[in-house]
UniProtKB/Swiss-Prot annotation:
Keywords: Glycoprotein, Secreted, Signal. Residues 54-72 have a biased composition (Low complexity). Residues 94-103 have a biased composition (Basic and acidic residues). This is Putative uncharacterized protein DDB_G0282065. GO terms for cellular component: extracellular region. It comes from Dictyostelium discoideum (Social amoeba).
Length: 109
């Protein structure tokens, strides 16, 4: 029984030594040839960040456009810019009419 344990342990040790040697023996000799997944991710992230941040000229152009044309809410159902003033006036007039009707109903009761 002791011999079997010794043989199993020695086989595991030999296996791990061979595994370690094979993993350390890579064909990559130059750092340029080593393109790991982290290098690819870092490169793509850097390209994304460079393309994401606008330069100063683009920011100035956007500010000028925003100053010339104030932002408008686009109605999702119609696709045209909303006129909030008319919408709010319509709501207020409906509320006033409803209040008048409620007051008249209360006076009648």
């Amino acid at each position: 029984m002791k011999n079997y344990n010794f043989i199993l342990i020695s086989l595991f040790i030999i296996f791990f030594i061979i595994l370690n040697i094979s993993s350390n023996n890579n064909n990559f000799t130059n750092a340029e040839e080593m393109t790991g997944i982290n290098d690819i991710i870092n490169r793509r992230y850097q390209e994304y960040m460079e393309n994401r941040t606008p330069n100063e000229q683009q920011q100035q152009q956007q500010q000028q456009q925003n100053n010339n044309n104030p932002p408008q809410h686009i109605d999702p159902l119609v696709g045209n810019p909303c006129n909030h003033d008319q919408i709010m006036q319509g709501r207020i007039s409906k509320l006033k009419e409803k209040l008048k009707k409620d007051q008249q109903n209360q006076q009648q009761n």
